[in-house]
């Protein structure tokens, strides 16, 4: 039993204390994190290289490692000597509900910020920028126009699914869109010849191609077909928490931590592109 001033806190008093800290109107996300010394991180198990599970089962990837760094900075802001990171697996379908319902504090995966999504959750300053493209078979069609009458795979419930439909419509191309439950399922469909191309963010496609049964038979189409600005999703309306997360990210960008996180994910000699360097320079807010 916890002691305060040498006196016991009996169950009734504990219940009242919990009610005061649990109410969203009384205590925000930062207060709860400080009270529990824990932060709840939602991540995807199937979105490498940004958010996925290692063979050991541990969450990893660029966004996961970035959120680990954010959590450390939040702990420093709250003067915590330790912080527990509780990871919650989510899918492309239920990820925003995990934040909106209060099950998780941060969504750490390749999340594209959009106006419609802002109706459900808030977003941090930008964390990455990517673009969607096509992973194709080297013996098949090599452009979006050449895919007329073919099957194109895409992850269901994502902005890339909407972008693919819009791209086909604007180009006047009739092709069958084959939704995949996971990127790995999409890769399997491409490997087996059930689809002629797989549509996703290019960084994800590069990683997927390396996992193919026959990577030498796959290639990336040249053109970017969309621009995807990533950010961390967090509870809507909690300005104090968003400010704390943005402060943490700004410090990570300014002190060079972001370069080490990037190198860990994309290879020891890999560095952020000129576009990403500019993004981090602009996004990092001064104290």
Residue locations for each model-derived region?
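Extracytoplasmic small-molecule ligand-binding "clamshell" domains
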Residues: 28-107, 255
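Ligand-binding clefts/hinges and TM-proximal coupling segments of bilobed small-molecule sensing domains
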Residues: 29, 162-178, 216-218, 249-287
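Beta->alpha turn/N-cap motifs
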Residues: 43-47, 88-93, 102-114, 137, ...
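Periplasmic-binding protein-like
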Residues: 45-46, 127-138, 202, 209-249, ...
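Ligand-binding cleft/hinge of the Venus flytrap
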Residues: 55, 68-84, 160-179, 209-214
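Extended ligand-binding regions for polar small-molecule ligands
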Residues: 64-73, 138-141, 145-159, 206, ...
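Acidic, polar ligand-binding/catalytic clefts
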Residues: 68, 79-146, 224, 282-286
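A ligand-binding cleft/hinge motif common to bilobed small-molecule-binding domains
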Residues: 94, 108-120, 163-170, 191-192, ...
């Amino acid at each position: 039993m916890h002691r305060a001033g040498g006196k016991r806190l009996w169950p009734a008093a504990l219940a009242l204390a919990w009610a005061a800290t649990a109410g969203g109107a009384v205590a925000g996300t930062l207060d709860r994190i400080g009270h529990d010394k824990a932060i709840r991180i939602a991540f995807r198990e199937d979105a490498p290289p940004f958010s996925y599970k290692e063979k050991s089962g541990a969450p990893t990837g660029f966004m996961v490692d970035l959120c680990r760094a954010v959590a450390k900075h939040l702990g420093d802001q709250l003067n915590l000597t330790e912080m527990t990171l509780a990871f919650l697996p989510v899918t492309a379908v239920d990820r925003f509900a995990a934040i909106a319902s209060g099950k998780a504090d941060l969504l750490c995966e390749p999340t594209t910020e959009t106006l419609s999504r802002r109706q459900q959750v808030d977003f941090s300053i930008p964390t990455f920028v990517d673009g969607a493209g096509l992973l194709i078979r080297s013996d098949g069609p090599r452009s979006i126009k050449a895919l007329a009458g073919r099957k194109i795979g895409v992850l269901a419930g994502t902005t890339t699914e909407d972008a693919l439909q819009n791209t086909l419509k604007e180009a006047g191309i009739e092709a069958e869109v084959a939704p995949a439950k996971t990127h790995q399922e999409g890769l399997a469909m491409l490997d087996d010849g059930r689809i002629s191309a797989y549509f996703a963010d290019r960084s994800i496609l590069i990683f997927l191609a390396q996992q193919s049964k026959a990577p030498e038979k796959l290639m990336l189409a040249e053109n970017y077909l969309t621009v995807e600005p990533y950010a961390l999703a967090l509870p809507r309306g909690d300005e104090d928490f968003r400010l704390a997360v943005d402060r943490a990210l700004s410090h990570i960008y300014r002190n060079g931590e972001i370069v080490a996180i990037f190198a860990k994910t994309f290879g020891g000699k890999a560095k952020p592109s000129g576009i990403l360097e500019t993004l981090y320079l602009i996004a990092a807010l001064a104290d």
